[in-house]
């Protein structure tokens, strides 16, 4: 029952989803903001804040999963019948893609991040094998060139693994392939070329990039600064 107000009954029960956090980490975050002269009116779980910004009421009613691709973690929020029914966080994120590129191309982390942002793609088959990247122009200590397809192959392996985490979690709660409104991607890596197609392929669900409301601010790294009422 969505709204029991005014109804007659003999017993009222509720299923609640409780979000907790590591207290020292929360206190440290608050202290940093206050030390910088900022004021905190409240705290909210990141993926939950993102879902309030980019998901429509219709999507939440139909059934939708929001995948928040962060630097070090991936957040998953699942909605059905207008309610948040599941949350999960996975200890893998965009930084893992960068690390894989650094190892695979034998370049610095900084150069790997630059290559990911400038030449990266999520689906290797969509990238030409003859397109070459001069590694030394990005990292003076590097040698030779790398094809964009090879770069995409490295990235695709890690991104497919990330979607496997998400799909396994959806299977665990019985929602894999069963969310009519599909998957909405947000976060710094959400607009990577080919990522939507890879998400559709791995999750077997309609997929799209979440677009925030105008009152929110999209930061340079693709994260959201969200104004919540």
Please report, for each region that a protein language model flagged, where it lies by residue.
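Nucleotide/phosphate-binding catalytic cleft detector across ATP-hydrolyzing
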Residues: 1-65, 84, 108-110, 114-152, ...
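Glycine-rich phosphate-binding loops at beta-strand->alpha-helix junctions
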Residues: 21, 121-123, 178-202
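Residue-level signature of catalytic and energy-coupling elements of molecular machines
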Residues: 33, 68, 101, 166, ...
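Short, ordered loop/turn segments at secondary-structure junctions
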Residues: 45-49, 81, 90-92, 117, ...
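Gly/Thr-rich phosphate-binding beta-strand-loop-beta motif of the actin/hexokinase/Hsp70
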Residues: 55-86, 101
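A conserved active-site cap/scaffold subdomain adjacent to cofactor or substrate pockets
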Residues: 91-115
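Phosphate/pyrophosphate-binding loops at sites that engage ATP/ADP/AMP, CoA/4′-phosphopantetheine
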Residues: 163, 167-182
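Glycine-rich phosphate-binding/hydrolytic loop that grips phosphoryl groups
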Residues: 211-229
């Amino acid at each position: 029952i969505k709204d029991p107000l005014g109804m007659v009954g003999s017993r009222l029960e509720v299923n609640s989803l409780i979000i907790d956090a590591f207290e020292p980490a929360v206190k440290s975050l608050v202290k940093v903001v206050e030390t910088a002269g900022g004021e905190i009116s409240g705290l909210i779980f990141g993926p939950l804040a993102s879902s309030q910004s980019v998901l429509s009421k219709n999507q939440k009613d139909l059934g939708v999963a929001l995948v928040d691709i962060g630097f070090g973690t991936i957040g998953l929020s699942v909605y059905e019948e207008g309610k948040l029914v599941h949350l999960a966080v996975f200890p893998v994120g965009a930084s893992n893609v960068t690390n894989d590129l650094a190892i695979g191309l034998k370049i610095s982390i900084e150069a790997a991040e630059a290559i990911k942002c400038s030449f990266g793609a999520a689906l290797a088959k969509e990238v030409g094998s003859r397109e070459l990247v001069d590694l030394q122009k990005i990292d003076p200590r590097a040698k030779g060139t790398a094809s964009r397809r090879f770069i995409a192959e490295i990235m695709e392996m890690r991104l497919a693994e990330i979607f496997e985490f998400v799909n396994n979690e959806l299977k665990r709660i019985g929602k894999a392939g069963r969310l009519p409104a599909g998957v909405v991607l947000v976060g710094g890596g959400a607009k990577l070329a080919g990522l939507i197609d890879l998400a559709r392929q791995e999750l077997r669900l309609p997929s799209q990039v979440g677009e925030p409301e105008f009152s929110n601010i999209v930061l340079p790294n693709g994260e959201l600064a969200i104004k919540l009422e």
